[in-house]
Amino acid sequence: MSLRLKNCIISLPRVFQGFKRLTVLFLKRFSSTDRDIQNLLSFCPELTNLRLSSFEGINCLNIQAPKLESLHVDGDFEEINLDAPNLHEAILSTPKAKSYQSVSVAHDKEGYVKLPLGSLSEIKTLAIFGFMKYLSKGCVLMKPPAVFTRLENFYLAICFWDQRQVLTACSLLQNAPNLKKLHIRSDPLSTRDQDQVSIQGLTLEMQMDHLITASMIFFKGLDYEVDFLAKLLSCTPALEEVKIEWMGEMDRSMVLTKLLALPRVSPRAKIIVT
């Protein structure tokens, strides 16, 4: 049983029995409150597929869904708490993350992270868009909150100008030992981080023995992007292919020469630029 709603207001009655047989719920362009959306989801015990997009009025998403397998969230929110032990796929995107990058968590001495990476440790597919600057201000750099033992597909959006984001991405990748496919979107420069750190030293211990394919879209030919790809090629012995979507304004032939000259630990690794 599925339910798809858009352009609506989610406001529950005082007595709400829930949707006991609902398995798929898609909500788009809607408004609600923290309590109403939490109660709605809590009273859908069979829910396996949830998509929430373009919403307002929700600051903290509390999702308790014991049978949830696929979660897509795209909207303005400040915190998300997950209790979904069977989750296999999570796509989390928010343009609002950058606006609270320096807000600390009360009574949390570990850092600033409100994105519950620990509760995502068992999933196979993970996409994080809009969170890297946010995560890089917290504890992910020094102490990654989870080891993604089952993660096979990883989607990341990184601003390579901001070296803290790059270091955070390396930290996350280092804790995905069975990763097979990596997809990266190179985001444009927003506000450059003043505390620039070279990635040369930190990624030396990163090892991804099972990575087979990697891709990067919106590649601009920046030295930071090339350096990241160089590190990737140096720690992936099973790598077969790196696909790059060119979006740069630099001399393409010069950048291609750099890319093709990068040493590769995998003899099968090919670099394809389109």
Q: What role is predicted for each listed range?
A:
Residues 1-274:
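Non-core capping and flanking segments associated with repeat-based/extracellular domains
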